[in-house]
From Swiss-Prot:
SUPFAM superfamilies the UniProt entry points to: Aminoacid dehydrogenase-like, N-terminal domain (SSF53223), NAD(P)-binding Rossmann-fold domains (SSF51735)
Family: Belongs to the tetrahydrofolate dehydrogenase/cyclohydrolase family.
Gene: folD
Protein's pathway: One-carbon metabolism; tetrahydrofolate interconversion
Organism encoding this protein: Novosphingobium aromaticivorans (strain ATCC 700278 / DSM 12444 / CCUG 56034 / CIP 105152 / NBRC 16084 / F199)
Binding, NADP(+): G166, R167, S168, S191, I232
Superkingdom of the source species: Bacteria
Gene Ontology MF: a single term: methylenetetrahydrofolate dehydrogenase (NADP+) activity
Subunit structure and binding partners: Homodimer.
Keyword annotations of the record: Amino-acid biosynthesis, Histidine biosynthesis, Hydrolase, Methionine biosynthesis, Multifunctional enzyme, NADP, One-carbon metabolism, Oxidoreductase, Purine biosynthesis
Name of the protein in its database record: Bifunctional protein FolD
Entry keyword annotation includes Hydrolase: yes
């Protein structure tokens, strides 16, 4: 068996197209563009790349992009003041504070300052609570993107056994909550789980988000399982001085056993920004009091 490749790049392009169409419809009804604000503190190179990409994608989707770039030595109080300003701005529907923040800042305090109804990253404790009890709220972009890929591939997930490897607040925990809501039987595992290969081998769905290069081997995978690889790890390439990206799953061996698998790159990665745009647009409709059909996006 050779696994089918789950093309996150193609799915993300389709999702962006739907977002663009609905952004146009929103502007016609609300008399303004949906707006996404991104706040960057410091000059971390990776964060700068992410922020540029998010701003470009926001504009391409037909939404307004607001970028606030602050120096690394910005006082926490000044960052909180920017967040409060964005909370009060009716042109801003979604707020994203790019992480990580400088060490002198309390990330949880900053996230808690964001209006939960503008928290399009889904990191606010209120949105985490809403997810846990099944109420509408914003879900972190990466796990929601994973769920979209799974439902597109498998349809109804009810009754399937799922293992989520990883327990972070950003991916692992919300991923488990989303799968529980789809009536999966969910096990949350991690690097210290006893007999981890045996645990994974029981799963119809494997979501790997543990941050360890190629940790999940092909002989861990149940034949016919669907594998979602969230990992993005840079490892030495074949040529000296070169690097390459790999996931948390040993793709070559897993692809011989699984029925479907996401590649790295080109799998989950493209979904994250596409879902961010989706969340920002949902926020715009809610903030404007305009009904958005649950299956529209």
């Amino acid at each position: 068996m050779t696994a089918a490749v789950i093309d996150g790049k193609a799915f993300a392009a389709t999702l962006r197209g739907r977002v663009g169409d609905l952004a146009t419809a929103f502007e016609a009804r609300a008399g303004r563009k949906a707006g996404l604000a991104v706040v960057l503190v410091g000059e971390d190179p990776a964060s700068q790349v992410y922020v540029r990409s998010k701003g470009k994608s926001t504009l391409e989707a037909g939404m307004a992009s607001f970028e606030h770039k602050l120096p690394a030595d910005t006082a926490e109080a000044d960052l909180l003041a920017v967040v409060e300003q964005l909370n009060a701005d009716p042109a801003v529907d979604g707020i994203l504070v790019q992480l990580p923040l400088p060490r002198h800042m309390d990330e949880q305090k900053v996230i808690a300052a964001i209006n939960p109804d503008k928290d399009v990253d889904g990191f606010h404790v209120i949105n985490a609570g809403r997810l846990a009890v099944g109420q509408p709220g914003f879900v972190p972009c990466t796990p929601l993107g994973c769920l979209m890929l799974l439902k597109d591939r498998l349809g109804d997930l009810s009754g399937l056994d799922a293992v989520v490897i990883g327990r972070s607040n950003i991916v692992g925990k919300p991923m488990a909550q989303l799968l529980i809501a789809e009536s999966c039987t969910v096990t949350v595992a991690h690097s210290r789980t006893k007999n981890l290969p045996e645990v994974v081998r029981r799963a119809d769905i494997v979501v790997a988000a543990v941050g360890r290069p190629e940790m999940v081997k092909g002989d861990w995978i149940k034949p016919g399982a669907t594998v979602i690889d969230v990992g993005i790890n840079r490892v030495p390439g074949k040529e000296e001085g070169k690097t390459r990206l790999v996931g948390d799953v040993d793709y070559a061996s897993a692809a011989e056993v699984a029925s479907a698998i996401t590649p790295v790159p080109g799998g989950v990665g493209p979904m994250t920004i596409a879902v961010l745009l989706r969340n920002a647009l949902v926020a715009a409709y809610r903030n404007a009091g305009i009904d958005l059909s649950a299956d529209a996006i």
